[in-house]
From Swiss-Prot:
Annotated segments matching region Disordered: 1-20, 37-68
Compositional bias (Low complexity): 57-68
Organism: Pongo abelii (Sumatran orangutan)
Pfam families: Ras (PF00071)
Region annotated Calmodulin-binding, chain positions: 266-285
Origin organism lineage: Eukaryota, Metazoa, Chordata, Craniata, Vertebrata
InterPro entries recorded: P-loop_NTPase (IPR027417), RGK (IPR017358), RGK_GTP-binding_reg (IPR051641), Small_GTP-bd (IPR005225), Small_GTPase (IPR001806)
Chain positions recorded as GTP binding sites: G82, E83, Q84, G85, V86, G87, K88, S89, N191, K192, S193, D194
Gene this chain is encoded by: GEM
Keyword entries, A-Z: Calmodulin-binding, Cell membrane, GTP-binding, Membrane, Nucleotide-binding, Phosphoprotein
Protein name as it appears in the record: GTP-binding protein GEM
Membrane topology (UniProt): Peripheral membrane protein
Cell compartments where the protein resides: Cell membrane
Annotated family: Belongs to the small GTPase superfamily. RGK family.
């Protein structure tokens, strides 16, 4: 996944459904539901400083990709939700390059909305990451709208706080009710995985919750940037799997399988055979597959 541009946006326009604006003020009052973001107008950009040469790489091997983007960038609105203090803003800042020296042009226009163009499996995509769940003001109104505007959701909890895990389960139920007729990609994110001695929620509990609520699961550590790259690659793949044609997704899967080891292929093959006649084994396999963000 190769990162290109980053934008953090915060605006002041009124709520007009006709406008295709991604500006979001501090109180979230002007949050808009829109389906197709427009191309953003030209703005002055600030290039990275020379000392930013030690940038952490966020690329997934795509130099030999068999897939190319034929219609330009695709936009995905991804919403961060979860209890306060679980690390949502830290994940957003890492995504935006705040905690990572940048080797590309970037804009800093606000605190709530982050835009980044990246490459996943050889195709360009732009994630517009919304992190306004805890904004002061009309929280109930804002939460309702957050449930409506996302193309995908990251429900974040802290592995050191069981209450945040239980809240994440509640949010999954609320999201299902709000988007009953839609197949929305959701990833349950157990953050702060580096705090091993303070763990209150086990990995198996996270997996089970993901299986029960039909979503994906990953543990991350924003503090040491563990699995953060994989998280944002994964959410792009999850949206694509639901939106794009079967043929296109098969090409992507073939691209990914070329890099898969033979032992892993063998385990996956035999696992499917055993699962056909064993419900308990099928549940275990589904629990394991919830970690795989490249499949539905």
């Amino acid at each position: 996944m190769t990162l290109n541009n980053v934008t953090m946006r915060q605006g002041t326009v009124g709520m007009q459904p006709q406008q295709q604006r991604w500006s979001i003020p501090a109180d979230g009052r002007h949050l808009m539901v829109q389906k197709e973001p427009h191309q953003y107008s030209h703005r002055n950009r600030h290039s990275a400083t020379p000392e930013d040469h030690c940038r952490r790489s966020w690329s997934s091997d795509s130099t030999d990709s068999v897939i190319s983007s034929e219609s330009g960038n695709t936009y995905y609105r991804v919403v961060l939700i979860g209890e306060q203090g679980v690390g949502k803003s830290t994940l957003a800042n890492i995504f935006a390059g705040v905690h990572d020296s940048m080797d590309s042009d970037c804009e800093v226009l606000g605190e709530d909305t982050y835009e980044r163009t990246l490459m996943v499996d050889g195709e360009s995509a732009t994630i517009i990451l919304l992190d306004m769940w805890e904004n002061k003001g009309e929280n109930e109104w804002l939460h309702d709208h957050c449930m409506q505007v996302g193309d995908a959701y990251l429900i974040v909890y802290s592995i050191t706080d069981r209450a945040s895990f239980e809240k994440a389960s509640e949010l999954r139920i609320q999201l299902r009710r709000a988007r009953q007729t839609e197949d929305i990609p959701i990833i349950l994110v157990g953050n702060k995985s580096d705090l091993v001695r303070c763990r209150e929620v086990s990995v198996s509990e996270g997996r089970t919750c993901a299986v029960v609520f039909d979503c994906k699961f990953i543990e991350t550590s924003a503090a040491v940037q563990h699995n953060v790259k994989e998280l944002f690659e994964g959410i792009v793949r999850q949206v694509r799997l639901r939106r794009d044609s079967k043929e296109k997704n098969e090409r992507r899967l073939a691209y990914q399988k070329r890099k898969e080891s033979m032992p892993r292929k063998a385990r996956r093959f035999w696992g499917k055979i055993v699962a056909k006649n064993n419900k308990n084994m099928a549940f275990k396999l589904k629990s394991k597959s919830c970690h795989d963000l490249s499949v539905l």
